[in-house]
Amino acid sequence: MCGICGFVGKVEDKSAILEKMMNRIIHRGPDDAGTYEKKEAALGFRRLSIIDLENGHQPMFNENGDVVIVFNGEIYNHREVRRDLEEKGHIFKNASDTECLIHAYEEYKEGMLSRLRGMFGFAVWDEKENTLFMARDFFGIKPLYYSCLLYTSPSPRD
């Protein structure tokens, strides 16, 4: 099983925090590891190879480099989704189900979830929109945990 981690926000020592997170999930992926750090997002990935062993390195990017994904799981119908996306003009570089998710996000945004069959958890950082989209499969076979802590004293001002 793979492992993903990350955070969004203006954080000092982003690299150190991401490294600690990656070390906590090292047992989830002996085959590969990758990180993404830019502006307000940091994503990490530990890989256990299942599909497309040669081309599944993550984080994975779209052609422009402004959409990035970390993904844990398997999309059972990725070939069907891929055919649909190719008909809409998307060009694929490899056969991984991860790349299929990037193109599905570009085409359908959150609506992509209704097209997916499988067990998965993923996080997509969209640099143009400055947004993080995270999802897991409908049955929770691949859990996805998130948390947020915000505090202030005294009250913030603009």
What is the predicted role of each segment?
Residues 1-153:
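N-terminus-centric sequence/structural signature that marks the extreme N-terminus
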Residues 154-158:
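A short, hydrophobic C-terminal helix/tail in secreted or cell-surface proteins
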